[in-house]
Swiss-Prot record:
A GO BP annotation: glucose catabolic process
SUPFAM superfamilies: 2,3-Bisphosphoglycerate-independent phosphoglycerate mutase, substrate-binding domain (SSF64158), Alkaline phosphatase-like (SSF53649)
Listed name of the protein: 2,3-bisphosphoglycerate-independent phosphoglycerate mutase
Domain of life, per lineage: Eukaryota
Length: 510
């Protein structure tokens, strides 16, 4: 049985349009040669093909979940939005319960989350639905808005803040109390100084230079501070105190965990925190199964992701990524399961400690590649998942030149990976989870920092049997796992409704 090396180039979409396309502009001789020499196809990685609304760009969480699942799963964005449409959201027991408690104690409800329509970590419609419920109880509501600028345009937050203002301006008991860029409130790389600034602003009633959120944002814009980097600033009094309640309304967990842990973990050591009496906390989805807090939309259990199938056959597997994407090749790839499966090893390569990744576009790709080659050479793993974060993380900075540098670095790394695969007669699969680096200038020639809806490449490179396989067209990310299982000659579980990309007789399902 050959080993399968699944290499995910995060944020590497496919488009023939060269304008603002770091991937087309960059010099990538290795990947170009592999694309031209081996079976390849394009996979849809956005919208309904990955369980998102039509036209919604894909993202790393959804992409890795879909790849690991081998099926299309309705994502939390769709699940929650549908509950708003069918009105079941407004009868949600956990949400109504926390509002009742605030009403009983005559205290404050704090709504904390990313305020945009990006749809990657949150959606502003979910905030408005929460406001609809909370307003029934006539309680004091403090909105703590996190500005985006990453999954939306860098200077687009005023639209969303104005939308919130229009909803609440007639109510004296509802205020936008703080605003903070996601750089501070949604760090996921243990940059505790960032999280601490956000945390302290939530706790202290020290007012900033204005109570007008639009004026405040404009002042930061004048200093060339975009939405993502707006410093945590207080606009109105309404700090978090005893007997208050908090609803964190991001549906994606990875970038809210640090802030939530600061309020909930007794063993938290990131920075000095305050202990609260009777502070009720609710998250829209499950952020961390180890936390003893209420969840409005508990995770649905899924079984027979590819990692579980590999483990059931007693085969060893390895997940390898740097910090920024470690959760994606482990937690998300395994369907929201924190603990590794039997025979599953994990290796974390620390991401560089820089303010933004355009300052170090190579990130930790060299160390990651060295670790991957060592693992391939051991020949003990039948399935290795590698994630290169550079195209996505550098692409998010909007710096085209830095992203081109990142792409060229990845190409050099893939050359080394491919040489190792050839030496060990291992199969190399190159693909991606979503687009980003392929679309870095918008229609106005302004930097675009968000993901694209472009398809992603899929290359099946085998050192031998070059002409054995043909790959079908019109596939999506859910088709990757069945393809790998067929290559390994393992049975495909019934739960996987993805279809193998190999144009040969399909393996029987179990």
């Amino acid at each position: 049985m050959k080993s399968i090396i699944l290499t995910i180039l995060d944020g590497w979409g496919y488009s023939e349009n060269k304008k603002g396309n770091a991937i087309q502009i960059a010099d990538t001789p290795t990947i170009d040669k592999l694309w031209n020499s081996y079976p390849n196809t394009l996979l849809n990685a956005s919208g309904r093909d990955v369980g998102l609304p039509e036209g919604q760009m894909g993202n790393s969480e959804v992409g890795h979940t879909t790849i690991g699942a081998g099926r299309i799963i309705n994502q939390d964005l769709v699940r929650i939005s549908k509950s708003i449409e069918d009105r079941s959201f407004f009868n949600n027991e956990a949400i109504n319960s926390i509002c009742q408690k605030i009403n009983f104690y005559n205290t404050k409800l704090h709504l904390i989350g990313l305020c945009s329509n990006g749809g990657v970590h949150s959606h502003i419609k979910h905030l408005f639905a929460l406001l609809d419920i909370a307003m029934r109880y006539k309680i004091q509501i403090c909105i703590h808005a996190i500005t985006d600028g990453r999954d939306t345009s860098p200077y687009g937050s005023k639209i969303f803040i104005e939308e919130i203002n229009n909803q609440i301006q007639q109510f004296n008991h509802i205020n936008i109390c703080t605003i903070s860029g996601r750089y501070y409130s949604m760090d996921r790389d243990c940059r505790w100084a960032r999280t601490e600034k956000s945390y302290n602003t939530l706790l202290k009633n020290t007012l900033g230079f204005t109570k007008d959120p639009i004026l405040m944002i404009n002042e930061y814009y004048k200093k060339n501070i975009s939405d993502e980097f707006i410093p945590p600033t207080r606009l109105h009094k309404g700090s978090i105190e005893n007997n208050d309640g908090i609803i964190f309304f991001n549906f994606r967990p990875d970038r809210m965990r640090q802030l939530v842990h600061a309020f909930t973990k007794s063993t938290f050591k990131g920075f000095n925190t305050t202990s609260f009496h009777n502070l009720e906390i609710l998250t829209l989805t499950q952020y961390d199964p180890s936390l003893d807090i209420e969840v409005a939309f508990p995770a649905k259990k899924n079984k027979n992701f590819i990692g579980e199938i590999i483990a059931k056959y007693g085969l060893k597997q390895l997940r390898l990524a740097e910090t920024e994407k470690y959760a994606h090749v482990t937690y998300f790839f395994n369907g929201g399961i924190e603990e590794p499966f039997a025979g599953e090893d994990r290796q974390l390569i620390p991401s560089p400690k820089v303010e933004t990744y355009d300052l170090d576009p190579e990130m930790s790709a060299t160390k990651l590649t060295e670790s991957a080659i060592n693992a391939i050479n051991k020949n003990t793993y039948k399935f290795i998942v590698i994630n290169y974060a550079n195209p996505d993380m550098v692409g998010h900075t909007g710096n085209l030149d830095a992203t081109i540098h990142a792409i060229q670095k990845i190409d050099k790394c893939i050359k080394k990976i491919w040489l190792a695969c050839q030496a060990m007669n291992s199969t190399l699969i190159i693909t991606s989870d979503h687009g980003n680096a392929d679309y870095m200038l918008d229609e106005n020639n302004e930097p675009c920092t968000s993901h694209s809806t472009n398809p992603v490449p899929f290359i099946l490179a085998e050192p031998t049997n070059i002409h054995t396989y043909h790959l079908r067209k019109n596939g999506n990310l859910a088709d990757i796992a069945p393809t790998i299982l067929q290559l390994l000659n393992l049975n495909i579980p019934n739960e996987m409704n993805g279809i193998s990309l190999l144009e040969t007789k399909a393996k029987n399902k179990i």
